[in-house]
Amino acid sequence: MLNTIVACLALNIYFEARDQPIDGQVAVTQVVINRVNDPRFSDNHCEVIKEGPVRNGLPIIGRCQFSWYCDGLKDVPKDQDAYRWAIMIATRVLDEGYEDFVDGSTHYHADHVSPAWSTEKTRVVKIGDHIFYRWEKKESKMIYREKNSEVMNRK
């Protein structure tokens, strides 16, 4: 049985980034974790992923933070190898920690779209076909270790 956090992160990796390079898949995971650590978002990984307006108990199509969650399709991975890979990435990121190479990014989008919010954020990096952004400039990198439930700033 999968840990709930790992399960949510793995689905997000699978549906948002399974066609991305490994560092792109980790970066998508980092965005969720950066949101969890940001007071503007929920401190719950699954709630961050599922954030968006609902109607009659269901997410409104096209209005979620992560598009796969409210696209109207079943959220069941078809490619089991890619899903197992996503589980492994989610587990490693949570268990082993990482240097935040998206530098605090809380947003990203595919490079073939230009959402209005992107002009109001600081562009950080492009990985694969995703462009990552953060709210504002910051000086420190963050290391996150789920196992110890701690966030350490490192300059």
Where are these regions (language model features)?
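Bacterial extracytoplasmic/cell-wall-associated proteins, especially those involved in peptidoglycan
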Residues: 4-155
